[in-house]
C-alpha cells in the first residue's frame, strides 16, 4: 500500500512539475541579422535561467508585430520603427530593453563613385519597406531636399525589397544604391560590389536602437517569468560583449550557418554593437521622425512615456552588477 501511495505521489509531483515547466516557456520572435545574435543566444542559456525559449525567425519587424497581435509571441526583437508602428496599430506591447545600436549603412555601386546623399538624385535606391533603414533614408533625403517615391518622377526612385534581396539587386545593377542592414552591407563592401557612402546617424534619431518588446500580458501577468527572461537577455548580451569569439562563432555558424565570414561579422558588429539600454527620449525622437517622413502612416502616434518600461532591465543589470 505504501508503495502504491508513494508511486502516486511521485506521479502527481511529475505532473505538477511538467505543468510548471510548461508555464516557463517564452515564445520569442526574432530576425536573422548579425546584431540580433545575442537575442538568439538567449535560447541556448535559457535552461540555466529556469525557462525555455522557443524562437521563431521572421523576415522583418512588422511580421513580428503581426505575430504578437495574433497572440503567437510573448517577446519580440525588432527595430524601433516596427515596435512604434505596432503599438500605434493596437499591438499590446511595451518596450523593455535595447539590444543593439546602429545597423544601417548607405551603400552604392563602386563604379558610380557616390560620396554623399545629394548625389542620389536621378538614382534608384533600394530599401526594405517599413524598416528603420527606410526612416533613416527618408530623413537623409529630406535633409538634402530630395523627393522620393516608388513611382518614377521624383528625385529618387525607391525600390522596396526585403533585406535578403537588396544585395542581389545591387550586384545585378537593378538598383544604384541601398540603405541596408548588417551584415548585408558589410558583405556587399567586402565582396567588392558595394561601397560605403555614409552611415545615416546624423538625424535627430542618432544611432537607431533595436528594441526588445514584451506583450503587456506577459509583462504584467507573468512577471516572475518576464524577470527570468530579462536576466537571461542581460547574461546573453554580456557574454557576446565580453567574448567576441563566442559571438562571432555563434552568429556565423548557428544563425547564418556559414553564410558570412569572420570579416563580415566583425565589420557588421563594428557598425551595430550589442547593447542593453533604451530610453523614452530615443523612442519619442524616432516616433517624431516617422511622423515627419511619413513612414508607418500612423493615425495616432504613441507617446513613448506611456509604453517604455525599463524597470525589469534595471533590476537585471543591478543583480548582475552591470552598469
Where are the language model's segments positioned?
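Hydrophobic alpha-helical targeting segments used for export or membrane insertion
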Residues: 9-15
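Secondary-structure end/capping motifs
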Residues: 220-299
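Short, solvent-exposed loop/beta-turn-alpha elements that line the ligand-binding surface or hinge
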Residues: 48-50, 202-204, 272-279
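Short, glycine-/small- and polar/acidic-enriched structural segments
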Residues: 24-160, 172, 176-182, 198-199, ...
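Bacterial N-terminal signal peptides that target proteins for export
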Residues: 1-9
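Conserved C-terminal helix/tail region of periplasmic/extracytoplasmic solute-binding proteins
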Residues: 291-323
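Sec/Tat signal peptide C-region and signal peptidase I cleavage site
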Residues: 18-22
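Pocket-lining segment of extracytoplasmic ligand-binding domains
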Residues: 81-82, 152-155, 159, 164-253
